[in-house]
Amino acid sequence: MMVIRPVERTDVSALMQLASKTGGGLTSLPANEATLSARIERAIKTWQGELPKSEQGYVFVLEDSETGTVAGICAIEVAVGLNDPWYNYRVGTLVHASKELNVYNALPTLFLSNDHTGSSELCTLFLDPDWRKEGNGYLLSKSRFMFMAAFRDKFNDKVVAEMRGVIDEHGYSPFWQSLGKRFFSMDFSRADFLCGTGQKAFIAELMPKHPIYTHFLSQEAQDVIGQVHPQTAPARAVLEKEGFRYRNYIDIFDGGPTLECDIDRVRAIRKSRLVEVAEGQPAQGEFPACLVANENYHHFRVVLVRTDPATERLILTAAQLDALKCHAGDRVRLVRLCAEEKTA
């Protein structure tokens, strides 16, 4: 059974293996053991209540409960940009016009922005390619909403997600090549690694501070503004179906889109509810997949179960109860895994 649980110190080697499979561009999962160990420690201290909000971050892993294999990782940053500035480009417009010459030009322009400062962030989503099946990707991504719904007071009103931009298998980023490299004088992979290992001072020191007309970029770079890496397209679709939208903010390195949503408008958060569990044989039938999570802050668990999402009493097997660290009579959080398709 696939189970979402909080990260543990013993997961570091498994996270190193996952990091080696990302192909670059996932800034928050560098193949650097010291950085990953520090990330785990920060997550543990967050759960223990030892960190200020500006440093808090939760990390979860997807584990096969039978073999102990760690198949994926996902995380939530509680409030971004309160220690180090949080940069985006806002894609806006500057108008240049002259009535006398009968000229009017509306030019797409990149403005350096810190507008998302203080937002909660969904980040570090990666599923081992060998495990991209049977709803694992949905479970990994959406499990975070169950945690946010259960412990709403831990998070801010807006939640954002930076999506991986267009980068090829050799680490070539058209956006970086046309813009970032001119100011940072390094390859994309180097800048990405520095950022992922916490060495972010260079961003503030070297970032262009003035608006940038996108027409000055190569056509290839212009074409990838706000676009996602092909492997990230499914993750973007998942978030958009939960209510997230692209509001013209992009990543300063690869030009990938930043999606955002008011936390209380996220479908899985808004529609999740508490039901009582009992032990037994679940009813047979064509039921949809549902997320089921316990309400245990320190021992949080999420699994996928096929059941009636409208039930008031959830029947689970002994194995499912054990995976959830629950007992009969406990209350668990339940929501349909995917939004119901609207019928005409």
Curated annotation (Swiss-Prot):
Superkingdom, natural source: Bacteria
UniProt-listed GO biological process terms: arginine catabolic process to glutamate; arginine catabolic process to succinate
InterPro entries, per the entry: Acyl_CoA_acyltransferase, Arg_succinylTrfase_AstA/AruG, Arginine_N-succinylTrfase
GO molecular function: arginine N-succinyltransferase activity
EC number: 2.3.1.109
Swiss-Prot/TrEMBL catalytic activity: succinyl-CoA + L-arginine = N(2)-succinyl-L-arginine + CoA + H(+)
Signal peptide positions on this chain: none
Keywords: Acyltransferase, Arginine metabolism, Transferase
Pfam family, one: AstA
Known function: Catalyzes the transfer of succinyl-CoA to arginine to produce N(2)-succinylarginine.
Protein's name in the database: Arginine N-succinyltransferase
Gene: astA
